[in-house]
């Protein structure tokens, strides 16, 4: 899919309401087009046990705490990637999306993570000093490398799947 195809508005685009956050049913028009192009393989990801249990709120407490610690560390790198993407586009829609996601990662998700982790007896010091797992480090190194060295389309391709996966989950309860 060419960059021009991603940014061009079509009659099938629906409005994006930033106040509702990024969800599978509330995506910016450019993201709707990218998501639709991936429909054939996308649903398989939601059937993976970890993602399914996370979404259902049935993930065992130890796994959930480990996930939250890793995700807490990840959010800072994810926000950096969006800042770099913001600097690489002139498109107001994409700029607003990058800024909204960056703000959400730093000011909303991190606060939720801190609250859950504190309820598990994990201190701020432990949260801030946790080492990323090898997998998490490989992933964040990859998206940061793309953000530093590639253009906005490559950055969007790198970050949108995470926004779609976690935006699509409704975590109603936590173990």
Task: Give names to the regions the model predicted.
Residues 33-36, 63-70, 124-129, 155:
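A ubiquitous short alpha-helical element
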Residues 39-44, 58-88, 108, 157-167:
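Alpha-helical bundle segments that constitute or directly flank the non-heme di-iron/ferroxidase center
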Residues 21-30, 55-65, 120, 145-150:
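Short, charged, low-complexity loops and linkers
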Residues 9-18, 22, 35-60, 78:
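Short alpha-helical hairpin
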Residues 29-33, 40-41, 46-50, 63, ...:
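Exposed alpha-helical structural elements
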Residues 2-22, 135-142:
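Sequence termini and other peripheral, non-core segments
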Residues 93-175:
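Active-site-proximal alpha-helical scaffolds that flank and shape metal-associated catalytic sites
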């Amino acid at each position: 899919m060419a960059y021009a195809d991603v940014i061009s508005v079509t009659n099938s685009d629906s409005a994006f309401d930033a106040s509702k956050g990024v969800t599978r049913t509330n995506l910016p028009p450019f993201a709707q087009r990218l998501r639709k192009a991936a429909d054939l393989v996308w649903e398989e990801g939601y059937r993976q046990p970890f993602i399914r249990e996370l979404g259902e709120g049935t993930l065992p407490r130890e796994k959930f705490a480990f996930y939250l610690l890793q995700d807490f560390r990840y959010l800072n790198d994810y926000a950096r990637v969006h800042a770099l993407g913001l600097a690489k586009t002139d498109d107001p829609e994409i700029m607003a999306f990058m800024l909204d996601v960056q703000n959400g990662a730093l000011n909303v998700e991190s606060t939720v993570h801190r609250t859950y982790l504190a309820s598990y007896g994990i201190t701020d010091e432990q949260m801030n000093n946790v080492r990323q797992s090898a997998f998490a480090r490989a992933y964040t190194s990859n998206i940061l490398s793309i953000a530093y060295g590639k253009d906005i389309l490559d950055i969007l391709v790198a970050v949108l799947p995470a926004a779609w996966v976690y935006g699509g989950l409704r975590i109603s309860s936590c173990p």
